[in-house]
């Protein structure tokens, strides 16, 4: 292995971990909904796939659109996470059996898009720098999948401690993360 490849591997691994921590944080909030292990596995895989597809799409888009779509992707992702958080808080205080947004079907799709939109922007910049696309998307997918699982499992544990208030706390975490994206400091 050449030093150049090792340098790129380390750089992309650090970047993949950073993007995956977003998925961990949001997974922590979503994990406070009562989830089965099969659902946790499925959610992690879907998030991982989106963390492969989004940067790949970003790399394909290249530098032509990076200035406009880069910030737009961040704002869309922040808005989706904010909306999911509000809906989770509403569901926590509503007298119903299930969450307002289910982490399956269209709810999972919104969740995955919201969490992975920042990786689209990263893909745009990686496309301009000529990074190895296969290595980048593989690392992004693996890190985000594993960190999503960790967040969901940790959220599940917190849910067992907090009971019915855990979904409201999960919603607050998603709102906070969405606001962080919408209102950069």
Curated annotation (Swiss-Prot):
Record keywords, A-Z: Cell membrane, Ion transport, Manganese, Membrane, Transmembrane, Transmembrane helix, Transport
Compartments where found: Cell membrane
Annotated HAMAP family: MntP_pump
GO cellular component: plasma membrane
Cystines in this chain: none
Taxonomic classification: Bacteria, Bacillati, Bacillota, Bacilli, Bacillales
InterPro entries the UniProt entry points to: Mntp/YtaF (IPR003810), Put_MntP (IPR022929)
Role summary: Probably functions as a manganese efflux pump.
Protein name: Putative manganese efflux pump MntP
Family in the record: Belongs to the MntP (TC 9.B.29) family.
Extent of the signal sequence: none
GO molecular function, one term: manganese ion transmembrane transporter activity
Gene that produces this protein: mntP
Keyword Cytoplasm attached: no
Pfam families: Mntp (PF02659)
Transmembrane segments: 4-24, 40-60, 64-84, 108-128, 134-154, 165-185
Entry keyword annotation includes Cell membrane: yes
Membrane topology: Multi-pass membrane protein
